[in-house]
């Protein structure tokens, strides 16, 4: 935006460069995934989460994550779970231990589309839309059976629905 407005973006460009270099330090060879890293302990969380798939949304087009994505999506029906279903820590109802969040799914889907992974992006979109259409604007959903959980009227879930519904209507009318 700054460049469009003909503003000085040197400082922000420097921040972006540092972040782009730093993101690769979040790759955890042990689990073959991007992972959370605890700066205090100096250790990885050793867990694949929905945040692991935010690499594409962040402009890091890493094909190594595709096999993890495919493996996990083959185990669920209602969007990207917030935690790996194969993990002993997985709990499909517990906050950030398994439920699917529409807002995270939207960002992952956008990232996949930006990376040219259109079929995978559509899978995330269709599964998320299925959860919302069947169960309303819940805060999050069980990724296996779609049961709504948390708050029942979340605006970010409604915003995801409206954003993706707009795209669906545009596609049906031959418009983007």
Where are the regions that the model predicts?
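Inward-facing hydrophobic residues that define packing positions of alpha-helical scaffold repeats
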Residues: 13, 20, 124-125
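Alpha-helical support elements that line or immediately flank enzyme active sites
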Residues: 51-61, 105-118, 125-128
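TerminUS-proximal long segments
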Residues: 116, 122-127, 148, 152-156
